């Protein structure tokens, strides 16, 4: 519908009176502009971002819907790129309620190897010990339904020893700085692989999500 970026609104592209489908505009982090059809069977987001608050001391943002009472939770996203030393006690005491841990990724080169994040085990164990809710995400480079299932099964294998109550996330991204094995995927391909991954995760009893 309307996408908010850095506090500014990008206007709906709209449609005409001849039955043309409405489209919406959005920007990525590099400010590239895109348009996509507005799906009439998908409910519009009801959040009013004018109710988004920023704590002056911590810089943390909070949101509570004045009508429904729905309240946002504060969380962080970590991977090996945050290094080996995270003070999880301090994370918990700062007000963080949940953490999304990168479980792994499929390399975007030709081999497409499945790789466990170097800090996955340590991050999950320490976050759980600190009393945080934990979810995980996997960076996908699937180019077939079979590879999407393979990725999901890789994730499930590495989840089974932990009490993961947060979402299990399918993370697919456009590789802008290099060539990638997914460059030939169509929009429908990405949709199909996402669905296959999420269905496999849900069948195993976890809550799937899309980054």
Indicate where each model-derived feature is located.
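Boundary/entry segment of secreted carbohydrate-active catalytic domains
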Residues: 6-104
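Substrate-binding cleft of extracellular glycoside hydrolase catalytic domains
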Residues: 60, 68-196, 202-204
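Aromatic-lined carbohydrate-recognition surfaces of secreted/lumenal glycan-active proteins
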Residues: 201-211
């Amino acid at each position: 519908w309307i996408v908010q970026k850095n506090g500014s609104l990008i206007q709906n592209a709209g449609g005409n009176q001849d039955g043309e489908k409405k489209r919406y505009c959005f920007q990525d982090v590099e400010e590239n502009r895109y348009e996509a059809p507005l799906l009439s069977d998908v409910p519009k987001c009801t959040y009013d971002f004018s109710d988004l608050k920023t704590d002056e001391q911590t810089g943390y943002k909070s949101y509570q819907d004045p009508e429904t009472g729905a309240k946002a939770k504060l969380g962080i996203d970590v991977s090996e790129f945050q290094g080996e030393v995270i003070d999880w006690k301090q994370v918990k005491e700062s007000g963080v309620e949940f953490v999304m841990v990168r479980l792994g990724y499929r390399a975007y080169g030709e081999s497409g190897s499945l790789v466990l994040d170097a800090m996955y085990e340590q991050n999950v164990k320490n976050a759980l010990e600190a009393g945080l809710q934990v979810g995980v995400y996997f960076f996908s480079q699937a180019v077939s339904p079979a590879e999407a299932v393979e990725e999901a099964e890789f994730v499930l294998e590495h989840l089974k020893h932990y009490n993961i109550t947060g979402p299990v996330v399918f993370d697919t991204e456009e590789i802008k700085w290099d060539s990638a094995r997914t460059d030939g995927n169509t929009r429908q391909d990405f949709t199909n692989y996402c669905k296959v991954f999420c269905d496999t995760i849900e069948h195993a009893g976890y809550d799937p999500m899309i980054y």
